[in-house]
Amino acid sequence: MTKIPPGEPDELFDAADERGFFPEKRTRNSPATAPAPATDTHYHGHRDRLRARYREHGDAALADYEILELILFRLIPRRDTKPIAKALLDRFGTLAAVFGAPLHLLQEVKGVGESVALDLKLVATASHRMLRSELRNKQVLSSWSAVIDYCHAAMAHETKEQFRILFLDKRNTLIADEVQQQGTIDHTPVYPREVVKRALELSATALILVHNHPSGDPTPSRADIDMTKLIAEAAKPLGIALHDHVIIGKDGHVSLKGLRLF
């Protein structure tokens, strides 16, 4: 049996217990077999009822915070996760915004440490991969709603501007999806020559430009419009078409092609 050496500080037991495996803080003098208070396990029946409701009725029977609770059950097995789920939604507003939030902001919510934040981001990554897989081997222009869903999930809640390019072949099938630049809160530097160079490297014959506005408002700026025109002009002589430039906001998107801005 491992014993604590005499004189070891009680702080040995004070390490962060993010996943709640120890319902009470223990010290050297605490009895190892002390029974946990009844309130520490009151949430187990709630978890069973919530799982049963989801099993029988699906997600339509659950509020957003309850869906988040179901996920947190696995991540934090020994703690009441309802307050954490509600705190996350209070902080970020929507389920999508919770999963889209940066790691450091997730960890500012009480009860969420690095491990739980990473696991929440893993759920978001799985969702993004699933949406992106819907674009594979499909004609992108005929799957436009899938393109928007994917781009919105991947970019709408980024806190900095991100410039992404979808490279297409002559059948308008997706060849590559690449983030070209990461900028500041309101600006991303884009170099038309580099965009065209990368298209030639991939043997792409068409492009869709996508970037986000962290402010949430997808209205294009004059700089957005001018940059789009420059890329279209650089690509056209090389037989590369610019199909669209889409700006993603938190609650919607704008198509520059749809607005006839280039």
Swiss-Prot record:
Q: Which Gene3D superfamilies match?
A: 5' to 3' exonuclease, C-terminal subdomain, Cytidine Deaminase, domain 2
Cross-referenced InterPro entries, in alphabetical order? MPN (IPR037518), RadC_JAB (IPR025657), RuvA_2-like (IPR010994), UPF0758 (IPR001405), UPF0758_CS (IPR020891)
Q: Where is the MPN domain?
A: 140-262
Alphabetized Pfam families for the sequence: RadC (PF04002)
Could you list this entry's UniProt keywords, alphabetically sorted: Hydrolase, Metal-binding, Metalloprotease, Protease, Zinc
Low complexity biased stretches: 31-40
Coiled coil feature spans? none
- Give the motif span (JAMM motif): 211-224
Which CDD domains would you find in this protein's record? MPN_DUF2466
Gene Ontology process terms (BP): proteolysis
Q: Which domain of life is it from?
A: Bacteria
Q: Where is this region: Disordered?
A: 23-44
GO MF assignments: metal ion binding; metallopeptidase activity
| Binding residues annotated for Zn(2+), in chain numbering | H211, H213, D224
Q: Name the protein family.
A: Belongs to the UPF0758 family.
Name the record gives this protein: UPF0758 protein R01728
Give the originating organism: Rhizobium meliloti (strain 1021)
